[in-house]
Amino acid sequence: TVDMVRSEDDLFRIYPYFPINGNQSFEILYIELDPGASNSSEPHAAGTQEYLIVFGSALELFVGTQKYEILPGNAISFLADQPHMYRNATDKMTTVINVIVYKNE
């Protein structure tokens, strides 16, 4: 069973299928963003890389001062050791597979 994590407004939901633990340096998340939903993340540790695959509708991704629009069926990777935000500016739900790889020290 996967314990869903939801935003206060219930517009953003994360399903941590493979959460981070002491035996692995990655996690795999399934994310649902309702129309208008957004989620900001503080920088992860230096060298952390995120990989996103987008389904449903377009996702706006803000990394530092850069903005990207990822269309359904497309993917992107980025260094997540800076502030970043996901936003669904469409009128349909967006779903994302998110793989976060933490740099081994």
Q: Where do the model's predicted regions map?
A:
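Short acidic-glycine-tyrosine-enriched beta hairpin
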Residues: 64-80
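Ligand-binding loop in jelly-roll beta-barrel domains
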Residues: 10-13, 24, 71, 80-105
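Short coil/loop residues immediately preceding or within conserved phosphate-binding loops
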Residues: 12, 28, 49, 65, ...
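Short, conserved beta-strand element in jelly-roll/cupin
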Residues: 30-34, 44-61
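Short hydrophobic/aromatic patches on the structural cores and recognition surfaces of FHA
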Residues: 17, 57, 73-75
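A short glycine-rich, His/Asp/Glu-containing loop-to-beta-strand
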Residues: 3-42, 99-103
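Short beta-strand His + acidic residue motifs that chelate non-heme Fe in jelly-roll/DSBH
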Residues: 41, 61-62, 68, 84-90
